[in-house]
Curated annotation (Swiss-Prot):
This is Fe(3+) ions import ATP-binding protein FbpC. Pfam families: ABC_tran, TOBE_2. GO terms for molecular function: ABC-type ferric iron transporter activity; ATP binding; ATP hydrolysis activity. The complex is composed of two ATP-binding proteins (FbpC), two transmembrane proteins (FbpB) and a solute-binding protein (FbpA). GO terms for cellular component: ATP-binding cassette (ABC) transporter complex.
Length: 345
């Protein structure tokens, strides 16, 4: 069953088309990430789902109930949708307990029990209840914002780049905790982000947005290993794209003959490998390697190697894990793991 269905959503500001025929389904209890560069339309789409913006056309269904189709519109406060903005947007004049309890109905004791349960749910120490927002860390503020959104028992949770202001280590830990919490609460969620690794690690379903359109929607691993086109491939991570000649499930390219993911394709094509699919080893000094390192850019854990292939003279640039012995002039071997992906067309 789908919690959310979008059919043909479009939006323009004056003569500028921001969204073009967006179709998307979000399964009950699942996590979806909408990822794209700045200006791709992802925040506009989130605001339309929330009810803050009205689309020019299309239909939104929330648990089968029509939210709007351009002529009629259910306002944001009647949709039962939780929203966590980028900065948390906590009420500065309310304590942690006041923020979480804002909008809760019932008597004082009942509200207190609910606030304590929500704080426990988002792993906030009860001793923080009397603190003010400015006394909290960034991660704690985001947990308070999430607890406040969950207090209304939403049918859908929208997260607008909620981790972007956090430090790198805290961002990963908070993201993991929020994902686990939403799964336990069985609340479907949509995360909007420009961070590819964040989208891939958070979601069950990733939607890549480009120029107001959804370029590809699917499981994170499918999009990463089998992107629909070269722009999507490079947006989701480092790539090595090669021209090749295909025949019977194999490709002849600058790396030699390697397996590909479509045995039916033949003739010229462009193929893609991810850097982690290429194992680079140092050759025996007495033997000639498959390639020679002509340049290296060391960046700590990862180094970028400029290679010249011995057999063809082709120049390649490949990222690999840094290690001793990788230096200009060194002879190396290359071993391709798995299959290369063939781009359509």
């Amino acid at each position: 069953m789908s919690t959310l269905e979008l059919h043909g959503i479009g939006k323009s500001y004056n003569a500028i088309r921001v969204l073009e025929h967006i179709d998307l389904q979000v399964a009950a209890g699942s996590r979806t990430a909408i990822v794209g560069p700045s200006g791709s339309g992802k925040t506009t789409l989130l605001r339309i789902i929330a009810g803050f913006e009205i689309p020019d056309g299309g239909q939104i269904l929330l648990q089968g109930q029509a939210m709007g189709n351009g002529s009629g519109w259910v306002p944001a406060h009647l949709r039962g949708i939780g929203f966590v903005p980028q900065d948390g947007a906590l009420f500065p004049h309310f304590t942690v307990a006041g923020n979480i309890g804002f909008g809760l109905k019932g008597g004082k004791r009942e509200k207190q029990r609910r606030i304590e349960a929500l704080m426990e749910m988002v792993a906030l120490d009860r001793r923080l209840a009397a603190l003010w927002p400015h006394e909290l860390s960034g991660g704690q503020q985001q947990r308070v914002a999430l607890a406040r959104a969950l207090s209304q028992q939403p049918r859908l949770m929208l997260l607008d780049e909620p981790f972007s202001a956090l430090d790198t280590g805290l961002r990963a830990a908070t993201r993991k905790a929020v994902a686990e919490l939403l799964t336990e609460a069985k609340v479907a969620s949509i995360l909007v982000t420009h961070d590819q690794s964040e989208a891939l690690s958070f979601a069950d379903q990733v939607a890549v947005m480009r120029s107001g359109r959804l370029a590809q929607v699917g499981a994170p691993q499918d999009l990463y290993l089998r992107p629909v086109d070269e722009p999507t491939a490079s947006f989701l991570g480092e790539t090595l794209v090669l021209t090749a000649e295909l025949a019977h499930g194999w490709a002849d390219c600058a790396l030699g003959r390697i397996a590909v993911d479509d045995r039916q394709r033949s003739g010229p094509a462009r193929i893609m490998l991810r850097p982690e699919q290429i194992q680079i080893g140092l050759s025996d000094p007495a033997q000639r390697g498959q390639a020679v390192i002509t340049g290296i850019d060391f960046a700590g854990f990862v180094s970028t190697l400029n290679l010249q292939m011995a057999a063809t003279g082709a120049q390649l640039e490949i990222k690999t894990v840094s290690r001793e012995g990788l230096r200009p002039g060194a002879q190396v071997t290359l071993n391709v793991m798995g299959q290369a992906h063939i781009f359509a067309g």
